[in-house]
Amino acid sequence: MKRNKIAVMILTVMCFATLCGCGVKSGEEFTEEVNILEGAALTVDAERATSTGITYTISNQSEKDLSYGRDYSLQQEKDGRWYRIEPKSEVAVTMELLWIPAGNADTEEISWEDAYGKLPAGNYRILKSFSDNERGYYLTGEFRIE
């Protein structure tokens, strides 16, 4: 039973990793629901945000264990709406299955200079996909580049 559960979780994460940007072309508005899992949050350390990377924390105070991967995408805010930013070069991430048990948090640091270059001044957010045993969720964390 546990082996089947792990296999389902791996397949779910792989599907989300593959579909994370599907259907949304660069410059198109992103309209999917985000941040709807009660008790789960992705926050960006505003003091450490630069044009080439951020440090963010995933907090899971929900009652569910969450799984996720290393993949992410960046979006830019324009006129109160969010638009996907197209990477300047191919992005390769490992297909690791990472876990955040209920009641825990994890802090990550990422650099996107190779994929996105240096971001100009503006409002941005990182988008990551997560799943529990029942469904998938998008979590976002907003930040500003001066």
Region annotations inferred by a language model:
Residues K2-K25:
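Sec-dependent N-terminal signal peptides of Gram-positive bacterial secreted proteins and lipoproteins
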Residues L11-M14, V34, I58, A92, ...:
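Short, functionally important structural connectors and interaction interfaces within domains
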Residues C22-E86, E90, W99-I100, S129-E146:
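Primarily secretory-pathway and cell-envelope proteins
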Residues E90-G117:
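Intrinsically disordered, low-complexity Pro/Gly/Ser/Thr-rich segments with frequent PxxP/GP/PP motifs
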Residues A105, L119-S129:
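A short tyrosine-centered beta-strand micro-motif
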